[in-house]
Swiss-Prot record:
Substrate binds at residues 89, 181, 211, 296. Signal peptide: none annotated. It catalyses: S-adenosyl-L-homocysteine + H2O + H(+) = S-inosyl-L-homocysteine + NH4(+); S-methyl-5'-thioadenosine + H2O + H(+) = S-methyl-5'-thioinosine + NH4(+). GO terms for molecular function: 5'-methylthioadenosine deaminase activity; metal ion binding; S-adenosylhomocysteine deaminase activity. This is 5-methylthioadenosine/S-adenosylhomocysteine deaminase. Belongs to the metallo-dependent hydrolases superfamily. MTA/SAH deaminase family. Catalyzes the deamination of 5-methylthioadenosine and S-adenosyl-L-homocysteine into 5-methylthioinosine and S-inosyl-L-homocysteine, respectively. Is also able to deaminate adenosine. Pfam families: Amidohydro_1 (PF01979). Its EC number is 3.5.4.28, 3.5.4.31. Binds 1 zinc ion per subunit. It comes from Thermococcus onnurineus (strain NA1). The gene is mtaD. Its cofactor is Zn(2+). Keywords: Hydrolase, Metal-binding, Zinc. InterPro entries: Amidohydro-rel, Deaminase_MtaD/DadD, Metal-dep_hydrolase_composite, Metal_Hydrolase, MTA/SAH_deaminase.
Length: 424
């Protein structure tokens, strides 16, 4: 299977050089980027007036939570979770979760996301949807034991069951990740066991860390230290760890994260909507910490649009620092692409020969994207997910000219309405 993308503005290489060129894909790899490629291909896409971008990597989300979009807004995190989200989640079944996963996959494909790091329940169902959709998914079961040894064993067993299920799919696109929810919902015993199992099985770990001041206070009262210091003291960190949020980090925390090569997944929309705080982006970057970008779940965003998320990230840190030079467009674009891919150990996030063919084509033939003075600026500050015309993952076209090839959009939307009616 080969694809030839012609006449586009290509965001090329590590330096994000924008060139007018063609892109040739064979199997699941980019094999050539050059002007006027004169070779036959199974599929030819005319990208005139369009931008050929690396697909976006959503480094933290809860994809089935689109079911809860708009059900509870304008609340602090713990009120939102305890009074609204957790009671609804207690009613979830595998079928309901699968419907939510379809809705999330549909939204991601239509907005140019090609890879996502997920944490939720019934992750075997999410894995089935990911496989069918054509997306690249890194899937974690959210482990919570609340200090109960019986729950610790149960959560570990469920995670291992999901791992075995995902490995049984034998897909290069669908991967298992260990996902202890957070230091305030997981015992030290569970966190240590996750670290041991990740070493044994060679898996990544993702965990919520230092999202709110309430969490900082709770962990400080319980252990006498910050969540980051706590995790460091038990030997939890490594280059295979991706922490979500990292809002409330002091200088010592940042030094620890940098020393261990931990990645932080920044979720600006969710952090602003829940008034959790502003993560110290510039200090993290200055320390050499890899920072990716995530949307969090749709219930606290309220979408999975990575183009939208880039703009919010850029604007948030400029106004917070009273400095228009921070979080510049190129920095934020890297966070949404290559930085996320790097965290996952994925040779993607860059359009270059030898890299995986995970690509989004964005239609710039629109008034809000003309004139084309600066492609990266337009992608960060002007574009949105509805401007994505074509999405390619692993060398397979999932959407072309806004037409979907792997999912039934009408059925997914109808099922979502039915399920939320039954849940509420």
């Amino acid at each position: 299977m080969s694809i030839l993308i012609k006449n586009g503005y290509v965001v090329y290489g590590e330096n994000l050089e924008v060139i007018k060129a063609d892109v040739l894909i064979e199997s699941n790899k980019i094999v050539e980027v050059a002007k006027n490629i004169n070779k036959s291909a199974d599929t030819v896409i005319d990208a005139k007036g369009k931008v050929v971008s690396p697909g976006f990597v959503n480094l933290h989300t809860h994809s089935p939570m689109g079911l809860f979009r708009g059900l509870a807004d304008d609340l602090p995190l713990m009120d939102w979770l305890q009074d609204h989200i957790w009671p609804k989640e207690a009613k979830l079944t595998r079928e309901y979760t699968k419907v939510g996963a379809y809705l999330g996959a549909l939204e991601m494909i239509k907005s140019g996301t090609t890879t996502f790091l997920d944490m939720y329940f019934f992750m075997d169902a999410v894995a089935e949807v990911t496989l069918e959709s054509g997306l690249r998914g890194y899937l974690s079961y959210g482990m919570i034991d609340l200090g109960d040894p019986e729950k610790t064993e149960k959560e570990v067993n469920e995670a291992l069951r999901i791992m075995k299920f995902i490995e049984g799919l034998d897909s290069d696109r669908v991967h298992f990740v260990f996902g202890p929810h957070a230091p305030y919902t997981c015992s030290i015993a569970l966190l240590k066991e996750v670290r041991r199992l990740a070493n044994e099985h060679g898996k990544l770990i993702t965990i919520h860390v230092s999202e709110t001041m309430a969490e900082i206070g709770q962990i400080s009262e319980r252990y006498g230290k910050s969540p980051v210091v706590l995790l460091d003291d038990i030997g939890f960190f490594g280059r295979d760890v991706i922490i979500a949020h990292g809002v409330w980090l002091d200088s010592r925390d940042i030094q620890i994260l940098a020393r261990h090569g931990v990645t932080v997944a920044h979720n600006p929309a969710s952090n602003m909507k829940l008034a959790s705080g502003v993560m110290p982006l510039q200090r993290l970057l200055n320390a050499g910490v890899n920072v990716g970008l995530g949307t969090d779940g749709s219930a606290s965003n309220n979408n999975l649009d990575m183009l939208d998320e880039m703009k919010l990230a850029a604007l948030l840190h400029k106004v917070h620092n009273l400095d228009p030079t921070v979080a510049d467009a190129e920095t934020v674009f890297r966070m949404a692409t290559v930085n996320g891919a790097r965290a996952l150990g994925l040779k993607a996030g860059i359009i270059k020969e030898g890299y995986l063919a995970d690509i989004a084509i964005i239609d710039f033939n629109k008034p809000h994207l003309r004139p084309i003075n600066n492609v990266i600026s337009h992608l960060v500050y002007s574009a949105n997910g509805n401007d994505v015309e074509t999405t390619i993952v692993d060398g397979k076209v999932l959407m072309l000219d806004r037409e979907l090839f792997t999912l039934d959009e009408e059925k997914i939307l109808n099922d979502a309405e039915r399920v939320i009616g039954e849940l509420t």
